Regions:
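Well-ordered beta-strand positions
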Residues: 111, 126, 166, 170-172, ...
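Terminal low-complexity tails and localization/encapsulation signals of metabolic enzymes
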Residues: 1-6, 253-266
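CoA-thioester-processing core
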Residues: 94-100, 108, 114-168, 182, ...
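C-terminal long alpha-helix characteristic of the crotonase
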Residues: 24, 128-133, 185-233, 240-246, ...
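Glycine- (often His-adjacent) and acidic-residue-rich active-site loop
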Residues: 58-96, 143-144, 227
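Conserved CoA-thioester-binding segment of acyl-CoA-metabolizing enzymes
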Residues: 1-59, 96
């Protein structure tokens, strides 16, 4: 998997890709280029066996302030409807690429996490925050609808319809305490422990059965649109496929030998 990216930071080590936006002096806003490069990177990640998990870090005390006011918001006001639709589809494609990449993604949120930055955290599988984290889906504060990049579909699944409606209608920031109580954040830790906590979670995931983890991520995404009967059948088929895998056999033999299984992702 390539780490020679231009519009964000990326390091790959021990099966974990650690990424972060790289404009800390402006609270890490997204640009047209960083949107597109992140989208393409997560698409490529789906087919890469080297990376087992992803950690998305803050930079300079902030996660992301969302779309850059000067580089994105200003130009959008001059675009045609067709050009605007091309842009909104492209930003949505980033979320689809994150959800479809097959690798668990952990967002480590500190400071400002707003707009598209909040969407990136939302589209992740696990979220860890500092007490200083402020997460805001503030689209209505710039005269836009809250239905951006899948927010109206995904956010209610995480925190509930009423709480999602409050954040999307008001555009206010959700505190770290609220985020943990509502189920948005899996844990809240001191700022000096944030990266280590996220990396520890990623290491545990990376040491697990990675093909099976991919199946779990796929089912978590797909079963929302299935009936209960369809979901149970889909899980039966997914589990039967995993039972054919070598990791299942490794786990069995390790259990019999009273050893810890070493998974290889096949």
């Amino acid at each position: 998997m390539r780490s020679d990216v231009q519009h964000f930071k990326c390091e790959i080590k021990d099966g974990i890709a650690t990424v972060a936006l790289d404009r800390p002096e402006r609270k890490n806003p997204l640009t047209f280029d960083s949107y597109a490069e992140l989208r393409d990177w997560f698409r490529d990640l789906h087919y890469d066996d080297e990376v087992k998990a992803v950690v998305f870090l803050p930079n300079g005390g902030n996660f992301s302030s969302g779309g850059d006011v000067h580089d994105i918001i200003g130009p959008l006001t001059k675009m045609t409807m067709k050009e605007l639709l091309t842009f909104t589809r492209m930003t949505g494609d980033l979320v689809k690429a994150m959800i479809g990449c097959g690798k668990p993604i952990i967002s480590a949120v500190d400071g400002i996490c707003a707009g598209a930055g909040a969407i990136i955290a939302m589209a992740s599988d696990l979220r860890v925050a500092t007490p200083e984290a402020k997460t805001a889906f503030l689209f209505n504060r710039v005269g836009l609808a809250g239905c951006d990049m899948g927010a109206c579909a995904i956010l209610p699944r995480i925190i509930g319809q009423g709480r999602a409606a409050e954040l999307l209608y008001l555009g206010r920031a959700m505190s770290a305490e609220e985020g943990q109580a509502w189920g948005f954040f899996n844990s809240v830790v001191p700022a000096d422990e944030l990266e280590a906590t996220a990396q520890k979670l990623a290491a545990k995931i990376a040491a697990g059965p990675n093909f099976a983890n991919m199946m779990t991520k796929t089912m978590l995404a797909q079963e929302w649109s299935m009936s209960l009967e369809q979901a149970i059948e889909a899980e039966a088929q997914a589990q039967a496929i995993c039972m054919q895998g070598q990791d299942f056999h490794r786990a069995y033999h390790a259990f019999v030998a009273k050893e810890k299984p070493v998974f290889e992702g096949d």
